[in-house]
Amino acid sequence: MRKWIALACCLALIGMTIVACGGGGGKADRQTGQAGGSASPGGNTSGAANGQPDEPEEVTISIYYPLPDQTEARRLEDDKIRRFREKYPHVNIVKSDWHYSVEEIGLKMAANEAPTFFNTWATEAKFLVEKGWAADITELWNQYPYKDQINPILANQFIIDGRVYGIPQKGYTTSVVLNKKLLDDKGVPVPDYDWTWEDMLRTARAVAEPEKGIAGIAPMGKGNEAGWNWTNFLFEAGGDIQEVKDGKVTAVFNSEAGLKALELYHRLRWEANAIPQDWALNWGEAVGAFSQGRTAMVIAGAEGPLDQALNQGGMLPENVLTFPMPAYEKGGRHIGVLGGDWLVINPNATPAEQKAAFDYITFDYFTDDYLESLERDIQARQAEGKYFVPPQFNYFDSNSEYGRKVQAIFDKYDNVYKYDPESTRLLDGKPEAQYHTQDYYAVMTNVIQKVFSEKDVDLKKELDAAAALVQADYFDKIVLE
């Protein structure tokens, strides 16, 4: 899914100490600055003793590689591998198509089968660090000449207690992606970008045709993504997931704001009849329904639904609009969960492997080589009748010199999707909770499924029970230092 012009000087520092978090938090490793084993990844020092520079240690790293159906992304990654190997011939590359899974990461780490670096999300930072499954890359980060030009909002998600554990690729604020053609076909007005819950409800109800299998909106109803989708509305109503105070983490999502968000879901299902009849959809299924024209709206980071709608569903850019999340009421904030893609280095990797992984991850950052590769990719897509969908937020500041260079390339091609500036201006990202976010999502998914399946469900009772469960099973077990 993702070179730094000064990395050559990093090679002169290949003997540097690389910090990595060990299993169970790795406190000793953090104190000593060691990742276990030799602090000199090159090992043999005889070359230096003879006045000759050491040859870099030959290493093999397994990299996070796009899935088989992501043909354009694979083509871009293959080009990066070729260029990286030209500069770093001592690094062998193995492609891994394992993508991060909460259910699988523990098994992968225990069996030493996780790739040298892997993708993950903002919610996982605390979890991975506490489990000892993310290498402490602070020393590598501090040596990186462009660290101060990395988007701070994204970078800060993986900086914990002053230590760095992940590298951002791109980010998003959860949005609503809308099929304008479905609305036009039914004569339903397209709402303003500065819209509200009632505007969304009214639009979803008006465009839905249950008898034809067309929904007005498809809130996710299966997997942790169901709880994630709903949390956007919790935030918009002024609520939060947890409160951290006086050394304790307390569940607070069973608030008045939480009840309002649950009532909205109940209205979408039972009053408006605007959600899919087969509402138990995970991310892929909901986004797939959108790209196939079976729902007018879907809630997600915009890049994925846009890519599927344009490149698989055959939709035209003018018919696929990206909206901020609706405000609870007129004049309110359009808050969406802040998310994105981060890459984490495996703490089981050797120092030399961790260094090579860091070099690979950052290889194209802030470089003219990447700009050339990006333009070639856009041109190749254009020749195939495909579209390029930029991320909402990149690892760099869009207003920086480099950001302006990227935008100049985008402006040259009509097959690059253009986000509406007014919609982008209204985006208001809120980071996910610090602790046990995925567990909270899973519990809320059960509540949402009850709301969608039982018309007479006691919303307050279910919300209170969910908060009590999350508190007892997860938050009460947190020991804060």
Which role fits each region the language model picked out?
Residues 161-169, 174, 198-251, 295:
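Extracytoplasmic/periplasmic solute-binding protein
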